[in-house]
Amino acid sequence: PPHQCFRRQRQMCIRDRKFVFGQDSAIDALTQAIRRARAGLRQEDKPIGSFLFAGPTGVGKTEVAKQLSKTLGLELIRFDMSEYMEKNAVARLIGAPPGYVGHEQGGLLTDAIIKNPHCVLLLDEIEKAHLDIFNVLLQVMDNASLTDSTGRKADFRNVILIMTSNVGSENIGSQSIGFSNNVSDIGSGALDKTFRPEFRNRLDKIVKFKALSVEIVER
């Protein structure tokens, strides 16, 4: 129901801060973007939201996605993109072409969305995915639909798409990954070099996570 959706959105900031420390600005940015989308300020043929979480390892990017799905009462579907670095990885996500083994089985991604059309889709370490997968994501962010190898169409209009990336984390500080005295946001230079403009321009928001300070770690 609509009143429950808005109440859950108001609760999201409070809930996430209980599990993720030192990332208030990132959580606020995500919450505002989702509120705008759910208020009808988005195109009907696009996902609810398409977000890139950028920041060092261990600062709460994946945890925020998990808590978001719990708060909104949505299924969390997660793919580790380090497993999809090869060219044939696209076939695993949307199904093998006709004549290839596994053609009748469809794809892991399309099957998951067909079964759970209302969900949070989490693609961890997206920078490791093969370039062909980015072409698939452009289709998803453009038209909120994807047709698998068997002709079935997966509808992404009620999906919150979240991708995480560690790109540029080495520039945050010289200490261990995820922990640094320098709490400034990641510069956009590394992201610009890694992700093509047509990909970045289709994102609703690049949510930048800061490195954790010593005070936050000691909580």
Language-model features and meaning:
Residues 1-3:
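Short, exposed "boundary/linker" segments that immediately precede the start
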Residues 7-11, 15-219:
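AAA+ P-loop NTPase nucleotide-binding core of proteostasis motors
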